[in-house]
C-alpha cells in the first residue's frame, strides 16, 4: 500500500488509521518549523475508514507538536465522492481544533486547489478568523510550492506527482525555459552554514566547537535560559537569512540589536539542520530507532554504546550541545522546556535518514534518544571526554559565573533533579 510506513508497529494505538499514511511528518521548513503533510489521495473509501478515529488520530499526532510552531501542506488531489468526509465532519473538526492548534500553525499550503476548495472556504468563512485566513497559501502546482518549501524534504505521494506532471503537459503555450542551475561555488573561508564540521575545524585553528554554535550557546546561556518557550518559537525568516549572511561573511552579530531572544535559538537549530550530515551521523540512524526495544533500565547504557561509534569531532560537539540543553532543562520552571520538550524540538535536528525523511513513527525513538541524552547528560557523557574539549573555554570560564564555570571546566552542569531518581545501568 502506498504510504505504508515499514516502521509502524501494529501496536500503535491508531494503527487502523496511521497505516494509510494520510498524515506524515516531513522535516522542517526554512524557519525550523515542523512540517506535516495531509494527502487526500491516501484517504480510503468511506466504508473503510472511521472518520471519528481519523479526527482522534489527527489530534493525537498533532498534540505531540502543537506547543511548537508548525506548518501543514494539504495535497487536495485524490479527494472524491468515494472518500470525501461530510461537511458536518469538517465543521466539527474545525471546532475540535481549538486555539492551541491554530495559534502555532504558522502556514497552511493548499496544493492543487479546486473549485470545491473555494466553495468550502466560502461556507466556512464565517467560522474562520481573518488572522487564520492569512496563514493560507494556495499553490496551483508543485513548482509554486517549491517557492515556499524544500520539496525534497516532503513525502509527496507518487499520485500527486503524476497529477502535477499531467497538469503541466496540459498547459497550453510554450513551456517555461529550463532553469539553469549555476555550478556550486566553493564556500567562503568564514562560512558557518551548510559546511561540514571538518571544514569548520580546518578554518578555525583546529577548534572542535564551531564558532556559530559557541556564539549562540554563550549568548543564550547568559541571557536566555529563562525565556519561556525557548527553541519552540520561530523567528522572522528574513532576519534569520540576514544573520546567516553576516556569520557566513565573518561579520559580528549582536543579538541585542534584534530584540528577539528566539532568534539565536533559531540560528542554532538552523546550523544543525544545514549540516551536510547530521551531528549523530547517518550511520547511527538505525541503531537509534532501536532504542524503544531496549529495556528501560538499560537505555542510558545503550545510548553510551551508540555514541562510542561517533567520530571524535561529532562527539565533542554533541557533548557541548547536550550539556547546554541540560542547563536549559534545569530552568524548565521558567522556560517550560524540560528534557522531553527539548527532545521534540531537537530530535530531527540531530539525526535524519540518509534517504527521504523520518516517518511519524520514527519520531518516537528519535525523540526518546534525544531526551535521554539531555535528561541523563551526566551519566551518558561521564565516561568519554573528547581530547582538547576542556581547553577551549579558558577565556569564557574566567568571565562566567560559578555555574557556567563548573560546566566549562568539568563538562558537568548543576546536578539535575532527574538524576537523584536515576537507578539505571
From Swiss-Prot:
Residue intervals of the CRAL-TRIO domain: 13-168
Pfam family, one: RhoGAP
Tissue: Highly expressed in skeletal muscle, lung and testis, and at lower levels in kidney, stomach and colon. Not detected in heart, liver, spleen, breast, brain, neonatal head or pancreas.
Xref: InterPro entries: CRAL-TRIO_dom (IPR001251), CRAL-TRIO_dom_sf (IPR036865), Rho_GTPase_activation_prot (IPR008936), RhoGAP_dom (IPR000198)
Domain of life: Eukaryota
Biased composition annotated in UniProt, kind: Pro residues: 174-189
Protein name in the entry: Rho GTPase-activating protein 8
Recorded name of the encoding gene: Arhgap8
Amino acid at each position: 500500500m502506498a504510504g505504508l510506513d515499514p516502521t509502524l508497529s501494529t501496536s500503535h494505538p491508531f494503527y487502523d488509521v496511521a497505516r494509510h499514511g494520510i498524515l506524515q511528518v516531513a522535516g522542517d521548513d526554512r524557519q525550523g518549523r515542523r512540517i506535516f503533510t495531509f494527502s487526500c489521495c491516501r484517504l480510503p473509501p468511506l466504508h473503510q475508514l472511521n472518520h471519528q478515529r481519523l479526527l482522534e488520530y489527527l489530534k493525537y499526532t498533532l498534540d505531540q507538536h502543537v506547543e511548537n510552531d508548525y506548518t501543514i501542506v494539504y495535497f487536495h488531489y485524490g479527494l472524491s465522492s468515494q472518500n470525501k468526509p461530510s461537511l458536518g465532519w469538517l465543521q466539527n473538526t474545525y471546532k475540535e481544533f481549538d486555539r492551541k492548534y491554530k495559534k502555532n500553525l504558522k502556514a497552511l499550503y493548499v496544493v492543487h486547489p479546486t473549485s470545491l476548495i473555494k466553495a468550502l472556504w466560502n461556507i466556512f468563512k464565517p467560522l474562520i478568523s481573518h488572522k487564520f485566513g492569512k496563514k493560507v497559501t494556495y499553490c496551483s502546482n508543485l513548482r509554486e510550492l517549491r517557492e515556499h518549501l524544500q520539496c525534497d524534504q516532503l513525502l509527496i505521494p507518487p499520485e500527486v506527482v503524476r497529477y502535477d506532471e499531467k497538469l503541466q503537459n496540459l498547459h497550453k503555450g510554450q513551456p517555461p525555459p529550463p532553469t539553469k542551475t549555476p555550478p556550486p561555488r566553493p564556500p567562503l573561508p568564514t562560512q558557518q552554514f551548510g559546511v561540514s564540521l571538518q571544514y569548520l575545524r580546518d578554518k578555525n585553528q583546529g577548534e572542535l566547537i564551531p564558532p556559530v554554535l559557541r556564539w549562540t550557546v554563550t549568548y543564550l546561556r547568559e541571557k536566555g535560559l529563562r525565556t519561556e518557550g525557548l527553541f519552540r518559537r520561530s523567528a522572522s525568516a528574513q532576519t534569520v537569512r540576514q544573520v546567516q549572511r553576516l556569520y557566513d561573511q565573518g561579520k559580528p552579530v549582536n543579538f541585542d540589536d534584534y530584540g528577539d531572544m528566539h532568534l539565536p535559538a533559531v540560528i542554532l537549530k538552523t546550523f544543525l539542520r544545514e549540516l551536510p550530515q547530521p551531528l549523530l551521523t547517518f550511520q547511527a540512524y538505525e541503531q537509534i530507532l532501536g532504542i524503544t526495544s531496549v529495556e528501560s533500565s538499560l537505555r542510558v547504557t545503550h545510548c553510551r554504546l551508540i555514541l562510542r561509534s561517533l567520530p571524535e569531532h561529532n562527539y565533542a560537539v554533541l557533548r557541548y550541545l547536550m550539556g547546554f540543553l541540560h542547563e536549559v532543562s534545569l530552568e524548565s520552571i521558567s522556560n517550560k522546556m524540560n528534557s522531553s520538550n527539548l527532545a521534540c524540538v531537537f530530535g530531527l535536528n540531530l539525526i535524519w535518514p540518509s534517504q527521504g525523511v523520518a516517518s511519524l513513527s520514527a519520531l518516537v525513538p528519535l525523540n526518546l534518544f534525544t531526551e535521554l541524552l539531555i535528561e541523563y547528560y551526566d551519566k551518558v557523557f561521564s565516561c568519554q571526554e573528547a581530547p582538547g574539549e576542556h581547553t577551549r573555554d579558558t577565556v569564557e570560564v574566567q568571565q562566567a559565573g560559578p555555574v557556567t564555570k563548573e560546566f566549562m571546566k568539568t563538562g558537568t552542569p548543576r546536578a539535575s533533579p532527574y538524576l537523584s531518581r536515576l537507578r539505571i545501568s
